Regions:
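Anaerobic metallocofactor- and corrinoid-dependent redox/one-carbon enzyme cores
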Residues: 2-32, 36-38, 44-45, 168, ...
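Electropositive, gly/pro-rich neighborhoods at or near active sites that engage anionic ligands
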Residues: 43-191, 197
Length: 523
């Protein structure tokens, strides 16, 4: 290929076509992009070897780590990507002595557009699913069917070119991801208890503190243990916000609140911050000099010249930096994206379904007339104000479920309550789409109908590959009439889009007022 890099896996890809040349819109350099492609090619080689060899638990973990590493805004470090690729190649030779070629990923990018599109859906879907399986594994939970599917899907990237079979594999990816999200839900709740509705302040108290970003609740728990009694407060950031709902985490009195808003605002919000930031997963953006000496990474996250906390999870350097920085001299008042001073979280499936009878009764009495799921990934595009405008325009007799970092567009709005039930219910992280699905399925069961027959509209925002696997799960479940934005994925070809529209009526977001009117059956 003539382009120095080729990447179109995220929503902000250049001109909604592809990133090429010297760097991507996310800040990933071309050499890192090419190294990540080589890593995927090596994983495909490993998957082929596993068909004849003897993969072990360590092989499975390496596959998860490799796929997770290539998710958008996880790894900007060409050196560590190449180290991981070498590890994958060594593992391939360990499990199977005969020679097996790796895959040249440019073959995928140069394939016919429909085949490329279907294989991209599978590849990006298993990247997202690998993140969920990786987090579950950190808590001691794994599933042989889920693990086996990664190998099957990777082999199909090279070896399957029948569009009908690939389409079935796309839906199979959604099916297996549903099982994987259930696995992670079980891992989280067994470890930390079922989330409970919790008010989370956005004000940062004076004194030393640490900001924890990403999704890894296990890393947060370890940091809370290591900082207990040391006069250091802990604040969540972005997708770590739902941690406040878990009893096993909120019991730590120094888990104080949430710092800032969506991940895309971190470069301005972290400017001259008098505290360290720990990234446990995505989304890390190119780090600016005004705070670079205070950023630490762990797990799959890697960025050149930053201090990385290894598998021993000794957070002493982070703790020392917090004490050195000292924090703010006085309490610092921060707000959400709409000016709110607090947000709520903890409305996972157990919390909501414990009030299912009450919700059903409110529907029957006409006090709740429609449900919305407004959530998904956030991002920098100005058009994402659509989601805020949509939520603001919803009538007072409607309930809104939200999740993932897209929640920051709406989670500090005061939309009131319906008989004591907040109109905005934050289900949790992106993987807690599982909770939203469980809630929808339970409501459908209560009303004796399908999810598609409920007064429910899904208004989804996407950015990276975890959103892809969630979308595939919704398609596997047969859920239709999804509004998807702020743009449709560049990797979905017109032919594949036609299939999705015909079978599922996926519709791009347009105008919040007209989309809302259609959802409510108004002209």
């Amino acid at each position: 290929m003539t382009d120095e890099m080729f990447c179109f896996q995220c929503q902000q890809t250049a001109h909604n076509e592809k990133c090429n040349g010297k760097a991507g819109v996310c800040g990933k350099k071309s050499d890192t992009a090419k190294a990540q492609d080589e890593l995927i090619g090596a994983l495909i080689g490993l998957a082929k070897a596993a068909e004849y060899g003897t993969p072990t638990d360590s092989t499975d973990r390496l596959v998860l780590k490799g796929l997770f590493t290539t998710i958008t805004n996880v790894n900007f470090n060409t050196h560590t990507v190449k180290e991981l690729t070498a590890e994958v190649k060594d593992e391939k030779r360990r499990i199977y002595k005969n020679h097996v070629d790796d895959y040249e990923l440019s073959r995928l990018w140069e394939a016919g557009e429909d085949i490329r599109s279907l294989k991209s859906l599978i590849l990006f879907g298993i990247k997202g699913m690998a993140a969920y399986a990786y987090h579950a594994l950190a808590l001691g939970k794994t599933d042989s069917e889920v693990n086996a599917f990664f190998y099957t899907a990777l082999r199909a990237i090279e070896g399957e070119n029948d569009p009908d079979k690939l389409l079935r594999l796309v839906l199979k990816t959604g099916e297996v991801n549903f099982k994987c999200m259930a696995l992670l839900d079980n891992a989280n709740t067994e470890s930390y208890g079922d989330p409970v509705p919790t008010v989370v302040p956005l004000t940062i108290e004076k004194g030393p503190f640490i900001v924890v970003s990403g999704h890894d609740l296990h890393d947060l728990k370890l940091l809370l243990e290591q900082t207990e009694g040391k006069g250091i407060n802990i604040y969540t950031h972005s997708e770590m916000l739902p941690a406040h709902g878990y009893p096993g985490l909120k019991k730590y009195k120094h888990l104080k609140g949430n710092f800032g808003t969506g991940w895309q605002n971190q470069q301005s919000e972290f400017h001259n911050i008098p505290a360290p930031i720990l990234f446990t997963t995505n989304c890390i953006m190119p780090v600016r000099q005004s705070y670079s000496d205070r950023v630490f990474t762990t797990s799959v996250v890697s960025y050149p010249e930053l201090v990385h906390i290894g598998d021993d999870k000794d957070f002493s350097p982070v703790i020392a930096k917090a004490l050195e920085c000292g924090g703010y001299d006085e309490d610092k008042e921060m707000t959400g994206m709409n000016g709110g001073h607090t947000v709520m979280t903890g409305f996972a499936h157990n919390a909501v379904l414990s009030r299912a009878d009450e919700i059903v009764a409110l529907v029957k009495r006409g006090k709740i007339k429609h449900f919305f799921l407004i959530g998904g990934c956030d991002g920098a595009s100005p058009s994402r104000s659509y989601y805020t405008d949509f939520a603001k325009a919803t009538p007072p007799d409607t309930l809104i479920l939200t999740l993932a970092c897209g929640k920051y567009r709406i989670n500090d709005l005061d939309l009131g309550t319906i008989d004591g039930i907040p109109r905005i219910l934050d289900c949790g992280q992106c993987n807690d789409a599982y909770s939203a699905i469980r809630i929808a399925l339970a409501l459908a069961d209560a009303f004796g109908c399908s999810v598609n027959d409920l007064p429910l509209t899904l208004v989804l925002s996407w950015y990276e590959q975890k959103a892809v696997c969630i979308l595939l799960t919704l398609l596997y479940l047969g859920i239709k009439n999804i509004l998807l934005g702020p743009t449709l994925p560049a990797f979905i070809s017109p032919g594949v889009l036609d299939v999705l529209v015909k079978n599922y009526n996926i519709t791009p977001t347009d105008n919040p007022e007209s989309d809302l009117a259609k959802a409510l059956g108004r002209k």
